[in-house]
Amino acid sequence: MTEIKFCGMTRLSDALVAAENGANALGFIFYPRSPRYLPPEKARELIRRLPPEVIRVGVFVNEAVEKVKEIYHICGLDLVQLHGDENPDYCRRFPAPMLIRAVSPRNGADLAVLDRYSCRAFLLDRREGALYGGTGGISNWELGRRIRERFPLILAGGLNPENVMTAIENVLPHAVDINSGVESAPGIKDPEKIRAVLAAVRRYQGIRETEEERKEPERFRIFERTDEKI
């Protein structure tokens, strides 16, 4: 089963639409230069009103370790996503089971480099200029297939209701992460596009999932709470 995360949530109404229609996780961006930045105090109030089964992911870009930990506790986050230039030594400051590391061809996402990181999963996104994701550009699916062969993979980068089924079919990621592809403006999600993405993923699963696959033990889940804390 392909898991689904919607990122860049800024409004409770959008978050509830995603959660109530089956999203596995929601992402909150704590990078002040992002148009989808959400102050920790506002994020905390929003998160408190979410259904308990939804996983809360905090997205950080080149932030001080202690600041990440502070926001993690203030907001009641479940997982931490590092979306900047954080090196393996920085990442080791966090328990691997609760860490998602975003990578892109520009920041050296080859298999040899990935071996140096300890994390729950890699998130493949497209980076343009000084922007750390959320650009709407399609990521490198060939690289995604290579990463998927060895690591749990979240596929991001330009996904929307029209192409998410094709992306899953080509890359076979453990999860997909959608941001600008379901927006009417940065940080403002379109409820119908959210529902359309979720419906498209369900259609794919219904078409591709065989009886034999249903009998297999459930595979590793990325969006799941862990016993690890920071």
From Swiss-Prot:
One Gene Ontology term of the molecular function aspect: phosphoribosylanthranilate isomerase activity
Catalytic activity as recorded in UniProt: N-(5-phospho-beta-D-ribosyl)anthranilate = 1-(2-carboxyphenylamino)-1-deoxy-D-ribulose 5-phosphate
Top EC class of this enzyme: isomerase
Domain of life: Bacteria
CDD domains tied to this protein: PRAI
Pathway, per record: Amino-acid biosynthesis; L-tryptophan biosynthesis; L-tryptophan from chorismate: step 3/5
GO terms of biological process kind: L-tryptophan biosynthetic process
SUPFAM superfamilies: Ribulose-phoshate binding barrel (SSF51366)
NCBIfam families assigned to the protein according to its UniProt record, in alphabetical order: PRK01222.1-4
Protein name: N-(5'-phosphoribosyl)anthranilate isomerase
Organism: Syntrophus aciditrophicus (strain SB)
Lineage: Bacteria, Pseudomonadati, Thermodesulfobacteriota, Syntrophia, Syntrophales
